[in-house]
């Protein structure tokens, strides 16, 4: 864990060096991924099944690769009642939040008489990647599938590594209306969604988190399909004063540290004694936390405490551009309203980031690795597209046509000019 004093003369230099550090050391998997993608593209289902045997040690067929409706129902029934209730509660709130994002079509006639506008249409098919193992989270299903459903996507295809499927993940899929689930993971699953493979039909966009192989596959396939983002390790910044319970703030910092040894948790406070109390609370919690090994590595290698006047916190947050930021303060808006670069902002002393991960309704798929400078979190805008509409009548074309001809000639594109000039009263 690093400690920074804003008052130190070399603070800005040291802080910038800290931000520029690369978190995690992902293997160079691009070459291996390229081979997997090409094999699935050219060999289809045969390559997909072969990779499942080699990498996942399961023997699937084109008939057994799909999760049946009966398996989905059984998984949902196996999920404890309180978890099913929480899934339904979360899904309803996510649905309500994202329903408010629906944009309206626009149409108008301008002063030249040209009819202009745009219309929004949903994507036809979307693939959702849901990791397996410890990272098989029902919230991943909800946060990716529910907005797609709200947007009006016709087909949502989910892929998840083979093996014992987490009942809660199947319960979440049922709640989100996902009936097409394929037991395949890794780069080969991403390739199958992009190119199609046997019974798996191609999609228009792929969303959802994954390991280095999945991320590399999404990067390579961008252009063949759309993707949501290239997700990095989780991040949180907590801006807190000494009126907070140190144990609460420690828990908030650990909530992201437990995801991954490469995750990053940063405390900004104006009180050194409070910072020390939070550090002590973290040390105590790590002794009993089930995910303590990952959390301890994250806090040790990538954590930071910044002692600075709270009025400086918006500028510091903008420099970090974190995935999540909490302002655990009275009247937090006085500072948060000045923040420009953050994936999600949580306000007040009783609004921990974990609420946003599950049940607030806002999306937990957020930009990482300082991408909040130019990117937003997942929303229905990721599942719709805007098409421009233009209509001229003879009178309005007579206004626009000559200018079109002039610009086309200036650009050396005679066929463009001709396309307009032949429609003008003077002809070509």
From Swiss-Prot:
Gene behind the chain: hisD
Enzyme category, top tier: oxidoreductase
Organism: Caulobacter vibrioides (strain ATCC 19089 / CIP 103742 / CB 15)
Cofactor requirements of the protein: Zn(2+)
Domain of life (superkingdom): Bacteria
Pathway annotation from the record: Amino-acid biosynthesis; L-histidine biosynthesis; L-histidine from 5-phospho-alpha-D-ribose 1-diphosphate: step 9/9
GO molecular-function term, one example from the UniProt record: histidinol dehydrogenase activity
Phylogenetic classification of the source organism: Bacteria, Pseudomonadati, Pseudomonadota, Alphaproteobacteria, Caulobacterales
Catalytic residues identified in the record: 323-324
Function: Catalyzes the sequential NAD-dependent oxidations of L-histidinol to L-histidinaldehyde and then to L-histidine.
Sequence positions that bind NAD(+): 129, 188, 211
Cofactor binding note: Binds 1 zinc ion per subunit.
Keywords noted in UniProt: Amino-acid biosynthesis, Histidine biosynthesis, Metal-binding, NAD, Oxidoreductase, Zinc
Identification of the protein by name: Histidinol dehydrogenase
Family recorded in the similarity comment: Belongs to the histidinol dehydrogenase family.
């Amino acid at each position: 864990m690093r400690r920074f004093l804003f008052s130190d003369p070399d603070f800005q230099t040291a802080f910038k060096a800290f931000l520029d550090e690369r978190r995690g050391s992902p293997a160079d998997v691009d070459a291996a991924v390229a081979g997997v993608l090409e094999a699935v593209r050219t060999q289809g289902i045969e390559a997909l099944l072969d990779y499942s045997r080699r990498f996942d040690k399961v023997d699937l067929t084109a008939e057994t690769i799909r999760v049946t409706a009966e398996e989905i129902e059984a998984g949902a029934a196996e999920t404890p009642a309180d978890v099913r209730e929480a899934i339904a509660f979360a899904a309803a709130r996510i649905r309500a939040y994202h329903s408010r994002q629906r944009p309206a079509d626009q149409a108008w006639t301008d002063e030249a008489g040209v009819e202009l506008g745009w219309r929004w249409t949903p994507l036809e098919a979307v693939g959702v990647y849901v990791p397996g193992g410890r990272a098989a989270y029902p919230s991943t299903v909800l946060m990716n599938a529910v907005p797609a459903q709200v947007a009006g996507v016709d087909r949502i295809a989910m892929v998840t590594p083979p093996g014992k499927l987490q009942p809660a993940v199947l319960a979440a899929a049922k709640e989100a209306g996902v009936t097409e689930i394929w037991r395949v993971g890794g780069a080969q699953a991403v390739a199958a969604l992009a190119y199609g493979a046997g019974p798996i039909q191609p999609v228009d966009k792929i969303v959802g988190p994954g390991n280095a192989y999945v991320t590399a596959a999404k990067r390579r396939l961008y252009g063949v399909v759309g993707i949501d983002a290239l997700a990095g390790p989780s991040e949180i910044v907590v801006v807190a004063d000494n009126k907070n319970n140190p144990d609460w703030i420690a828990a908030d910092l650990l909530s992201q540290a437990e995801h991954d040894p490469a995750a990053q948790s940063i405390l900004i406070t104006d009180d050194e004694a409070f910072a020390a109390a939070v550090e002590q609370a973290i040390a105590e919690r790590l002794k009993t936390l089930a995910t303590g090994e990952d959390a301890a590595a994250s806090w040790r290698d990538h954590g930071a405490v910044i002692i600075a006047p709270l009025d400086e916190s918006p500028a510091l947050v903008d420099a970090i551009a974190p995935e999540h930021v909490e302002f655990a303060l009275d009247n937090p808006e006085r500072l948060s309203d000045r923040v420009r670069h953050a994936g999600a902002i949580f306000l007040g002393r009783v609004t921990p980031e974990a609420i946003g991960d599950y049940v607030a309704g806002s999306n937990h798929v957020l930009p990482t690795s300082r991408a909040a400078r130019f990117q937003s979190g997942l929303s229905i805008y990721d599942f719709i597209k805007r098409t421009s509409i233009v209509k001229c009548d003879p009178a309005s074309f007579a206004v626009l046509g000559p200018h079109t001809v002039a610009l086309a000639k200036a650009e050396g594109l005679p066929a463009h000019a001709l396309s307009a000039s032949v429609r003008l009263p003077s002809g070509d």
